[in-house]
Design a protein with these regions (language model features):
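Short histidine-centered beta-strand/loop micro-motifs
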Residues: 18-21, 67-68, 73
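Short structured motifs
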Residues: 59-66, 78, 92
């Protein structure tokens, strides 16, 4: 089993809410940035997605807040594939956000697919993208699911 991909961030003033802790949507922003960075590392840059006329689209995003994160703290965001359809169209990813001391602060689970940017329909990705997704670190509970959108 491969270690999760990990990205580090420092909480900015703009990431805070009026209570002085990390704004709820900032967790999702960090998760999205970590996801995009992982794809970039596999060669799927924004420019490459534009060439393919393909992009990721989310259907569901579930966030579980466990511990408070405050201003100027450093956090680490892990990314793992938690599910992939047999044809590669649909996928699930899990992001865990850890405080600098290793405390799990938040878990973000997302479910998405690949969108054909011309037809605006869900599309089977090219083989090179399916291969990249298959190489991504996986959660312990990773599951392959059928070609239809997972529930």
């Amino acid at each position: 089993m491969t270690d999760p991909d990990c990205r580090e961030f420092r909480v900015r003033w703009a990431d805070l809410d009026p209570n002085g802790h990390l704004r709820h949507t900032a967790y999702m922003d960090y998760a999205a940035q970590a996801r995009v960075a992982l794809l970039h590392d596999y060669g799927f840059t924004l420019e490459r997605f534009q060439e393919l006329r393909l992009g990721p689209v989310l259907f569901r995003e579930e966030t579980r807040y466990l511990h408070e994160v405050r201003a100027n703290e450093r956090v680490s965001v892990t990314t793992e594939l938690s599910g992939l359809s047999a044809n590669g169209k649909h996928w699930r990813m899990r992001h865990c956000i850890f405080k600098a001391d290793g405390t799990l602060a938040c878990v973000v689970d997302v479910q998405g697919a690949w969108l054909d940017l011309r037809t605006r329909r869900i599309a089977t990705p090219p083989a090179e993208l399916v291969q990249a997704m298959e190489q991504a670190p996986r959660t312990r509970d990773f599951a392959e699911f059928g070609a239809r959108k997972p529930v």
